[in-house]
Amino acid sequence: MNKKTDITLVGFAVNPEAAGKDNKYYNFLDSIGAKFLYNKFFDTYTTEPMALLHIAAQLKNANFNVEVIDGIIESLSKEKLIERLLQSSSDVYAFTLYDTSEEDIIDIMKEVKKHKPNAVIMTGGPYPTMEYEKILKKYDVIDYITIGDGDKVYINYLNAINNNESLSSVKNLAYRDELGNIQITEREVVDLDEQVPTDRMFAQQVIDKGFSLGVNTSRGCAHASCSFCYLKDYQTVSCQPRIRYRSPENVVNEVKDLIDRFHIDKITFCDDDFFGTNIEGLKRACDIFELLIKNNIKMDIYVIGRVKTMQYMIEHDMLPLMKQAGVSCVYLGFDSYNDDILKRYQKGCTVSDINTVVNALHENGIRINPGLITFEPVLNIDHVKNNIELFKILGYYDAYMFTRVLVILPQMRKKYFNDEELDIYDDEYFKDSQTKRLFEELSKYRDMVLPLYRLIVRNEITEDVRQYLYAEHYNFFDYVYNNLKQNKEFDTEQYILECKSRILEQIKPICESEYCDDRKKGYTLQRKIKN
């Protein structure tokens, strides 16, 4: 007889509309590859649900029976996810909750509660931490919210329930008391070196698709100064320091273990800020690099950093060490390629600084994955044009980059935009009508081209085909931008149909389908039936 599950950890994709999808549920891992056209950037993507897997590891280490159901990596529809949850033997369900997917997640919680009235519903993460009072007042279906670090909360909660102890002893927990008043317990932060390594239950699936496994080497951001970022508020509520580090030895030991277990040749250090402060943080980063070299670990390494940090490393000649250690790609939070917007974002750098960093990294053979906010409420079309130009300079492409939008958490709306109701789905999100039109037209192109990209066989796409598809996308942007700039009347429907026809013709030899028949209402695929 199977042992009863003590707790089920649940992840689910953000609302499909937020990712520019068409309300269909595609295989998540396959969809990512298509989005990047299987180029040199897609394998840096970390697809493991790291937070869920890390908490699962701590629970297992404390001898609890844990189930992880992740709607994203398992490509579950809302209905399929509910079906899986109702089949679980658990009475405790801990959900991830995002502002962008709140409605869907709450619906799922209600379905669980409807069929299992005695089930305990918990949630956590940055958004619930910052908005715990509002969420507990609004949703009776949620019983508890973890505040900040969740590593020990679920262990301590289960122990308290099993031992009939007061929940006031469980740190980092918000809940309603017997009178309905919201209580929050004492906050604590965990020592990262004391945590057991992340569970890797999805590792082989991720590796087989060509993606990188992820390793968290720190928590937080040493700077947390970007004006639109939630992190400072999150850390205030959860009483966390700006940044915490794992020791270099601890990090490299996990890397060695992953190499031994999975024979990997690439890894992503998926911190918010791998390098941290310019003194302590960079010393730790260099110590990690030196340990990797000392242990003769040869692999592609992907890290996340800031423009200001890269400037410091350039000035102190640290890039050669980083390259020698195996760093082949750096994700940099540029956020904008406009001086006025960089100032407004409080980035502490200029377009000239960005150019210096880009040139230095490229000279050292390190490619750049750009963190760039293509659209947000106050941008005009020239701001957007400059952002697109940076993508071009970097040689970067993914199908979503033309329609990236700043998702604004509730507590940032009033502070940053003086608009408490601002939402990415509202007609009034964009303050400039031309910017709104540009975004809408680019969204139409994206939604046309993504289903076509999904037809492409990964191993058969060539660099020439990629460059052709990149050029079509850039040309469409230029077409819309130039018409808007000249205040011309235009309709993209026919232009998009013509692009679609050209793309179908170009990719037909490398598609999974036997042929693509372009019809009035789209295309029909006649797939080969393989024995």
Enumerate the predicted regions with their spans.
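Glycine-rich beta-alpha loop elements in corrinoid/cobalamin-binding modules
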Residues: A51, I55-E186, Q411
